[in-house]
Amino acid sequence: MQNWALVIGINRYWRADACLKGAVKDALKMREWLTSIDGGAVPSRNLILLLSPHDDPESCGGASALPATQDMIIQAIEQIFRKSGEEGDRFFFYYSGHGLTARMSFSNESGIIPNDFSDTLTNKALSLRSIFERFQSTRFREQFFFIDACRNIPWEGEREFLISQYPLPKPPKPPVFPQFIMYATSPGVKAVEIHEAGNERGAFTDALLAGLRGTGNAKLWHEEDREYMVRWDNLFRFVEEEVIRRRLSVSENRVPPLIQEPRQFGERGSCNPTLASLPAEVFPEVSLDVHLDPMTVASQTEVIVGDLGGVLRREFPVTALPVHFDLQPRTYSIRTSTPDFRSEKRYYQVDLYGPAEVSIKMVPGTGYSTPVSPSSGVSKSVDGNTATASVLMRSHDPLAYLELLDNSGTTIETGIGQIYRPRVKPGFYRLRLRTPEGIPHERLVELSSGESADITLDAPPQTDSGLFTHIAFTSHMYQGEPNIIQPSEAIGPAQSMHLSTILALAGGAVNEDSSYGGKLRGLGITSFRNIAGEEATSGMQILFGNEVTAPAFTDNYLSAVRLRCWGIDRGIPAEYRQPLHVADITGLAQATWEMEPGSYLLSIELPDRMPVVFPVAALSNRLSLLVVTQDATGVVNFFRYLPSLKDELPGDPRYEAARFPVLRRLEYIQRSCMVGRFEQAYQNARELLNAKWIDPMAGLLGSYLLMRLGKSDELCIPARNLSECFGELSDSHVIAAEYEAGIGNEEKAADAFRRALDNGLPIMSDCLTKLIYGMERYGIEHPRAALAKSYYSHGIKGLLWSACPRKACEAAPGETGADA
């Protein structure tokens, strides 16, 4: 199979002040790398180039290009599909030009702006998500998207904005092949051009091309192949660090200034593909300076530098500090040997891909001063014989996602909480802890021959996000470490928590009769039964958290929220409710409904967005718990849970003291799903699927992940459990239908799809999509078929949960007010 590419560069726009200078140049440079045999290895005939202007020999450098209009972008993609048969080894998509993020109710839709876009023809903007989704239905084994574009909302005061979708959609075909997406900047933020006369270029593309050429730490040395590799993870880290290093301000009159920061996205597992392989002789030596503290030990100290092949350089006696070495770029181990002192650490590792300094602290004593023979090194024992090593890596947090990688970035093993690898070759390894969003925190370690290492990884410090920090400190959840929170004794130390995590746990704790959860109940959230009555057995509770920093704005914002809830077969009610503020904590509010078991619709009307309607399932003896958070940048996230209202066993095998801790794991899974980290989410969901006690939300999320990962043959037990125990959930029957269809039971699949409609609408967007395709496949007629099709056709894309703008349901009613 072959590689394919679409390259787009747009300088010319509808107004002179909207035009760019460097986008076409960047696109031509990217085309040059893509068609190079040492780069993307895309045959010229397999690459389509779209430029604006496309017919100016001076700006286009003589390249043959087509105009970069919306129609031509779509036609170019379809042409690649026809020529390739929608399959290949790799597909590359590069875009340089203007972009935007349009606020679409509960989601922010990022799009590119073709040449024919204008402030009146705004529908010419093209949704990136819809392009990504279309490629998920193809068989390109690795898909790379590089987007050098702004993602800021285009005009001051514009809140809702239409971005056109890719007009020829197809559903994804599990298992979807991995997508690697790199954005020049964060949602809602500009991307900056570097203005040098005659050499204008995008800061992002400038760093990207440098990384693809192997600059700095974008590359890693592969010992077995004796060459450098530029892999995705290191490439993104290099681009991110390089753009941030330039501190490109993208805001005016803001303190602190808003800085351009690249972001990555994409549905992928632990894949870390190689984008370039480069020979050793291409790169010059780099400098390493070793400092000794105290300096007085220098005259009796030997400094030894080694790599995987053994000792490379020695310096004895040390006559001057720092000790200077010029070495080939790669990973090194530094040791010292001295009679009366030892280094504070046995060895010091350094990724030497740029000039570096290492300071070695020397303390009185012996212990690491065994003479090192010329044949010894990190891969050999002192006598020259190689013995395997072992490593136990763990986290303070039992739910943390861990990765063990070799020195070149190849994944060896992944796990939750800890990984034990008993027999590994001595050498350098990379130990990673990833947040639910996939942000890595890496530690480089060296395993010597025969060594048994026990290493605890720390997560990145908690982000200072205003309301979250206030709650954590005032509730005494911090335990002295900036990256560890302890929300309850039933949970213990936890990392990578968000405001949504605390609200989910608090919502669970206040609705459970447990001796645990005192800090969480102290937030002041009222339990469902304290509002609905002790006899209530089913209903809904919504928790709102707003992290905008201005208290007056936050209070006014939450006071303007309106909520409506009605039976699925009824009309939208005129009466609305408003959430009640949680006492003493600005930014928190709650609303509660008692409900009979059944299927409902919920309209959430935020003051700066279109009203959005979500399907809601009220289950017997369970609470439909919804958590809605808005961060300081205006991004709204929506989380769902179905905790029990009666006494039962805990649903999480790692937390047996109470039931509410399972909500933390479910929140982590949802956060990973929101950014496409499905393999990471599945590691956590798999334990819940195998647990003794069934949690309906764990079943839904776990089954969703099985389907996304192409593991539908494993749906048998989850589908049966959901259908038998939680048949009131429409999603349960969609999952059962998918399983039956997968094993060829067409009649049972059709019956299950009908039962899904009998029980309302699926609450998960993926299940709604599968229901629609099932209805079409089996010709299903049902009184709710039109409703399901309407929700699907008007649905808000990019959400984990089914949602539809309320205006797509029917005209808004007259309004009366009532508190929740």
From Swiss-Prot:
Entry's Gene Ontology BP terms: defense response to virus; proteolysis
Keyword field contains Hydrolase: yes
Enzyme class name: hydrolase
SUPFAM superfamilies: Caspase-like
PANTHER family reported in the protein's UniProt record: MUCOSA ASSOCIATED LYMPHOID TISSUE LYMPHOMA TRANSLOCATION PROTEIN 1/PARACASPASE, MUCOSA-ASSOCIATED LYMPHOID TISSUE LYMPHOMA TRANSLOCATION PROTEIN 1
Family: Belongs to the peptidase C25 family.
Function description: Probably a dedicated protease for substrate gasdermin bGSDM; cleaves the bGSDM precursor, releasing the pore-forming moiety, which integrates into the membrane and triggers cell death. Involved in defense against bacteriophages. Expression of bacterial gasdermin (bGSDM) and this neighboring protease is toxic in E.coli.
Name listed for the protein in its UniProt record: Probable protease Ga0182885_104520
Naturally occurring in which organism (per UniProt): Desulfuromonadales bacterium
